[in-house]
Amino acid sequence: MKSPDEVLREGELEKRSDSLFQLWKKKRGVLTSDRLSLFPASPRARPKELRFHSILKVDCVERTGKYVYFTIVTTDHKEIDFRCAGESCWNAAIALALIDFQNRRALQDFRSRQERTAPAAPAEDAVAAAAAAPSEPSEPSRPSPQPKPRTP
């Protein structure tokens, strides 16, 4: 299992700004097993992090001659547009890391549900076993004496 800090991919990625002109800003992207960190060009600025628990999907992949354009859709349905060099395949790397994260999370949820229901299961099994088990043999039943018919 990969540690959350293990870098899966690192390199240049461009993010479309939310400003009026929607300029493409170069970022240094660092992809780990639980997030995508975007470092701005200026070294003093803090990175922005897109954690996978807040991402729904990687969508709208379009290829042009030089770039691959894709959109990350967040859980609050915000769309963030990116582009990268065609050969870098950032969109595929992010999509695969997201799927891996979602699979791990689904397994954790499943295991935690099993652990919560596990203490109740032995009690249910004991009740079912008691109902299915034959009762302990009791004393053999004696035939009840029949009254003799009266003769006149």
Swiss-Prot record:
Keywords on record: Cytoplasm, Membrane, Phosphoprotein
GO cellular component: cytoplasm; membrane
Ranges of biased composition (kind: Pro residues): 140-152
Membrane protein topology class: Peripheral membrane protein
Chain segments carrying region Disordered: 112-152
Function: Plays a role in regulating placenta growth. May act via its PH domain that competes with other PH domain-containing proteins, thereby preventing their binding to membrane lipids.
Domain notes per entry: The PH domain binds phosphoinositides with a broad specificity. It may compete with the PH domain of some other proteins, thereby interfering with their binding to phosphatidylinositol 4,5-bisphosphate (PIP2) and phosphatidylinositol 3,4,5-trisphosphate (PIP3).
Name this polypeptide is given: Pleckstrin homology-like domain family A member 2
Species this chain originates from: Homo sapiens
Gene: PHLDA2
